């Protein structure tokens, strides 16, 4: 089972790198063996160090966010109870903001970040599926240097400040004594290399900000809050690194008539009192504008739900559709003509004089059938 690295540090899943480092420093000061010699503290210190290592590594953090555990996939500490690769440096980073030992330069070419884009569609578009045009402000490959960062396509040279290590080492005094710490080189930004003739378009980064048009194919049956992954459509990485992914989050706007519940649709239908009593068939308009026949059973009650199977939303990437739930809104007229009033009064008198409408209707079929016929013909 994957460990809860966010819980170990006491941060939420949306925590920034600075928040993660701040939480780690707080725990490191509390549980460091030189401050707290207990075995329990040593275990908590080890857990915090591993969690910090994982969550400050973009690739490892992505594995965690997908439900995995990078420390169980050959990407973490190699020895039980150890601090993992770079763990000792993380300990000193908690106290002094730098590492105790050299970790080596980071690659100048970095993978790009994922991008989240939110868009809204109508319920009709969610029913049929739709292609949505998106315009993104994102990092794209520099068209002038094609990602190399160099104006003349020259190869990077070793940084003269850090001599290729990517780090600047310093000696700091602490309660532990003199400690050698290291920080990313400010000249090469920790890569150990510099571009001798930076591209004037991207300043040597290999990418620029630009607006880019993308078409998102939104499938039929999608629901609010769902995300569509478009691989390689995110931001291009530094140094012309591979682009991240684009996630399009869809919000389905409310509809004036239909309410959605999963793959089912709900709608109110107005049923005249006589049709509810005698039974009838009504034509209603579906979400797509087609006419649907709704059978109203005799004796239908107010707020009764009539299910129309297979008339709901399409199932996402599957066959079939949900159901349409028709909620009966019983309509009682506020104004009636004299003939209608006369017939209704006859029904009322008939019901008063007979204890059972069904039984007496059979015995006095002439009057009941006559009234029934007249109401059907109105």
Swiss-Prot record:
Superkingdom of the source species: Bacteria
SMART domains recorded: DnaJ
One Gene Ontology term from the biological process aspect of the record: DNA replication
GO molecular function: ATP binding; heat shock protein binding; unfolded protein binding; zinc ion binding
Binding-site positions, Zn(2+) 1: 142, 145, 199, 202
Residues annotated as domain J: 4-68
Cofactor(s) annotated in UniProt: Zn(2+)
Keyword Chaperone: yes
Family: Belongs to the DnaJ family.
NCBIfam families on file: DnaJ_bact, PRK10767.1, PRK14278.1
Protein name per Swiss-Prot or TrEMBL: Chaperone protein DnaJ 1
Lineage, opening ranks: Bacteria, Bacillati, Actinomycetota, Actinomycetes, Mycobacteriales
Gene (name only): dnaJ1
């Amino acid at each position: 089972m994957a460990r809860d690295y966010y819980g170990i540090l006491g941060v939420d899943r949306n925590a920034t790198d600075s928040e993660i480092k701040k939480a780690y420093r707080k725990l490191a000061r509390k549980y460091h063996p030189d401050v707290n010699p207990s075995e329990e503290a040593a275990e908590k210190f080890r857990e915090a160090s591993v969690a910090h290592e994982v969550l400050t590594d973009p690739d490892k953090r992505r594995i965690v966010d997908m439900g995995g555990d990078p420390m169980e996939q050959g990407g973490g500490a190699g020895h039980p109870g150890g601090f993992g690769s770079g763990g000792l440096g993380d300990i000193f980073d908690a106290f002094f903001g730098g590492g105790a030992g050299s970790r080596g330069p980071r690659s100048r070419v970095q993978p790009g970040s994922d991008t989240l884009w939110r868009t809204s569609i109508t319920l009709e578009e969610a029913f049929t599926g739709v292609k949505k045009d998106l315009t993104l402000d994102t990092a794209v490959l520099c068209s002038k240097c094609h990602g190399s960062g160099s104006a003349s396509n020259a190869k990077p040279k070793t940084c003269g400040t850090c001599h290729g290590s990517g780090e600047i080492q310093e000696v700091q005094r602490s309660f532990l004594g003199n400690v050698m710490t290291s920080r990313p080189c400010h000249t090469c930004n920790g890569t150990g290399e510099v571009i001798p003739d930076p591209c004037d378009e991207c300043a040597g980064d290999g990418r620029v900000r630009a607006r880019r048009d993308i078409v998102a194919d939104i499938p039929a049956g999608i629901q609010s809050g769902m995300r569509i992954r478009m691989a390689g459509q995110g931001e291009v990485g530094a140094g012309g690194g591979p682009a991240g992914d684009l996630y399009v989050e869809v919000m389905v706007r409310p509809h004036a008539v239909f309410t959605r519940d999963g793959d089912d649709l709900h709608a109110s239908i107005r049923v005249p009192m006589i049709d509810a009593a005698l039974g009838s068939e009504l034509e209603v308009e579906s979400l797509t504008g087609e006419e649907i026949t709704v059978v109203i059973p005799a004796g239908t009650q107010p707020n009764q739900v009539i299910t129309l199977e297979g008339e709901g939303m399409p199932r996402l990437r599957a066959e079939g559709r949900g159901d349409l739930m028709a909620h009966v809104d019983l309509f009682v007229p506020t104004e009636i003509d004299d003939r209608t009033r006369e017939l209704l009064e006859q029904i009322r008198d008939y019901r008063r004089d007979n204890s059972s409408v069904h039984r007496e209707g059979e015995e006095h079929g002439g009057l009941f059938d006559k009234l029934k016929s007249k109401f059907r013909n109105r």
